[in-house]
Amino acid sequence: MSQERPTFYRQELNKTVWEVPERYQNLSPVGSGAYGSVCAAFDTKTGHRVAVKKLSRPFQSIIHAKRTYRELRLLKHMKHENVIGLLDVFTPARSLEEFNDVYLVTHLMGADLNNIVKCQKLTDDHVQFLIYQILRGLKYIHSADIIHRDLKPSNLAVNEDCELKILDFGLARHTDDEMTGYVATRWYRAPEIMLNWMHYNQTVDIWSVGCIMAELLTGRTLFPGTDHIDQLKLILRLVGTPGAELLKKISSESARNYIQSLAQMPKMNFANVFIGANPLAVDLLEKMLVLDSDKRITAAQALAHAYFAQYHDPDDEPVAEPYDQSFESRDFLIDEWKSLTYDEVISFVPPPLDQEEMES
């Protein structure tokens, strides 16, 4: 929020009162979820259309308050072409005592990868460019020691020039309920995170990229499981059942016992599964869709794979500034999280206008 307080105006949209600076005009609702509602708006200062998100009850509980602080800290930190960043953050409150609402402003992204896959069969060159950009964004995110956790086509925004941004970090851990049944939330999830096998690492995101890449190449969801067990069966049918080395790493005894009860299956030949695909694409998929997360390719390694030869530029694949997430282990009260969040709102410095390059 800029230093001198702007003039705000109030408007009711979908039974929610929005109180925003005059800079943002023509608000129109575009969606809402558990954690907030989003409006498209015209930013009179830049001439661009933006997305304004009003967080829902940001401080109603300690969990909400910490989530609000986490989302703001993450968005403020992200400064990369392939990752959604923060254009503005504001509150109508004039003081910490009045502070109850948080609004976040980001680029308005037109389509997501879901829309793109449904509409057209993609060429191999399209797939190269899209997956390259996801990995370029992931290298940046992972370098800050952040894991997205929820990469899927609907969390990848693409404009008409095929430029891509990663959205919606896995800020809130999904509940068991949201992961149950025939749901996309789970189809792109690495087995170790879906089934709580073990402590997971950044390569959970690489598994998701493999699932997305396979879908772009074939036009079909790779592992559309109807439930957790069906999902695991679909995965093991492709990549084979785990060997002794991986079984030893699975800390959950019940998961280990269940896997050992299944019939042994060999890994399929990916070239026979992805018929007609570029052999380099198939080779990369084999390195991403590895059951043992310790042996999965990293984002930085994947960028150097021959499949991306025409896009890879080691001097233009930046890493992030260090990100201090020591707050994650803190047990603060609501008012303490609220005060920390207020400080982050007040201290926000908007990006230079020429960085707002991506209009969709």
UniProtKB/Swiss-Prot annotation:
The modification Phosphoserine is found at residue 2. InterPro entries: Kinase-like_dom_sf, MAP_kinase, MAP_kinase_CS, MAPK14, MAPK_p38-like, Prot_kinase_dom, Protein_kinase_ATP_BS. It is found in: Cytoplasm; Nucleus. Its EC number is 2.7.11.24. Serine/threonine kinase which acts as an essential component of the MAP kinase signal transduction pathway. MAPK14 is one of the four p38 MAPKs which play an important role in the cascades of cellular responses evoked by extracellular stimuli such as pro-inflammatory cytokines or physical stress leading to direct activation of transcription factors. Accordingly, p38 MAPKs phosphorylate a broad range of proteins and it has been estimated that they may have approximately 200 to 300 substrates each. Its cofactor is Mg(2+). Activated by cell stresses such as DNA damage, heat shock, osmotic shock, anisomycin and sodium arsenite, as well as pro-inflammatory stimuli such as bacterial lipopolysaccharide (LPS) and interleukin-1. Activation occurs through dual phosphorylation of Thr-180 and Tyr-182 by either of two dual specificity kinases, MAP2K3/MKK3 or MAP2K6/MKK6, and potentially also MAP2K4/MKK4, as well as by TAB1-mediated autophosphorylation. The modification Phosphotyrosine is found at residues 182, 323. The modification N6-acetyllysine is found at residues 53, 152. PROSITE patterns: MAPK (PS01351), PROTEIN_KINASE_ATP (PS00107), PROTEIN_KINASE_DOM (PS50011). Coiled coil: none annotated. GO terms for molecular function: ATP binding; enzyme binding; kinase activity; MAP kinase activity; mitogen-activated protein kinase p38 binding; NFAT protein binding; protein kinase activity; protein phosphatase binding. Gene3D superfamilies: Phosphorylase Kinase, domain 1 (3.30.200.20), Transferase(Phosphotransferase) domain 1 (1.10.510.10). Keywords: Acetylation, Apoptosis, ATP-binding, Cytoplasm, Kinase, Nucleotide-binding, Nucleus, Phosphoprotein, Serine/threonine-protein kinase, Stress response, Transcription, Transcription regulation, Transferase, Ubl conjugation. GO terms for biological process: angiogenesis; apoptotic process; bone development; cartilage condensation; cell morphogenesis; cell surface receptor protein serine/threonine kinase signaling pathway; cellular response to ionizing radiation; cellular response to lipopolysaccharide. ATP binds at residues 30-38, 53. Belongs to the protein kinase superfamily. CMGC Ser/Thr protein kinase family. MAP kinase subfamily. It comes from Rattus norvegicus (Rat). The modification Phosphothreonine is found at residues 16, 180. The active site is at residue 150. This is Mitogen-activated protein kinase 14. The TXY motif contains the threonine and tyrosine residues whose phosphorylation activates the MAP kinases. Component of a signaling complex containing at least AKAP13, PKN1, MAPK14, ZAK and MAP2K3. Within this complex, AKAP13 interacts directly with PKN1, which in turn recruits MAPK14, MAP2K3 and ZAK. Binds to a kinase interaction motif within the protein tyrosine phosphatase, PTPRR. This interaction retains MAPK14 in the cytoplasm and prevents nuclear accumulation. Interacts with SPAG9 and GADD45A. Interacts with CDC25B, CDC25C, DUSP1, DUSP10, DUSP16, NP60, SUPT20H and TAB1. Interacts with casein kinase II subunits CSNK2A1 and CSNK2B. Interacts with PPM1D. The gene is Mapk14. It is an enzyme of class 2 (transferase). A motif (TXY) lies at residues 180-182.
